[in-house]
């Protein structure tokens, strides 16, 4: 599934040169698609609205912050650096439904997902996605 969406694979150097908010916007989309697909796969009888509502439980800033708390110890040095760049990035938007700390951690999480996706690191993406499902049951 993941290969189908990428136009090309970025080298690690190319991905590191991207703005962390660019990585985060890609990571946000990829994580959302994964979660919605996971929910639909588990119950094909759900309406689109129910899939959406269930997905929110996984993709909201508070949930992504919880995921980061749990997986941070498993990150490589490189992954931790990407996460921290995303977390510390100055965002032009202010969170409406989350506190700033959760929002920043969620941005770091999304930057990490975007980085792993663009560089084609499917093994680490699968690890993070599977852990996310376990954590936010």
Predicted segments, located by residue:
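Double-stranded RNA-binding/processing signature
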Residues: 1-137
């Amino acid at each position: 599934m993941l290969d189908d969406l990428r136009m090309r694979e970025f080298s690690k150097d190319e991905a590191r040169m991207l703005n962390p908010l660019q990585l985060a916007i890609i990571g946000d989309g990829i994580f959302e698609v994964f979660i919605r697909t996971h929910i639909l796969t588990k119950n094909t009888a759900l309406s689109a609205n129910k899939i959406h509502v269930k997905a929110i439980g996984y993709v909201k800033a508070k949930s992504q912050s919880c995921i980061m708390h749990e997986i941070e110890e498993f990150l490589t040095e490189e992954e931790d650096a990407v996460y921290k760049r995303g977390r510390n990035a100055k965002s032009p938007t202010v969170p409406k439904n989350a506190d700033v700390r959760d929002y920043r951690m969620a941005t770091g999480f999304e930057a990490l997902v975007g980085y792993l996706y663009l560089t084609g690191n499917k093994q680490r993406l699968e690890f993070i996605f599977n852990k996310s499902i376990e954590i936010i049951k």
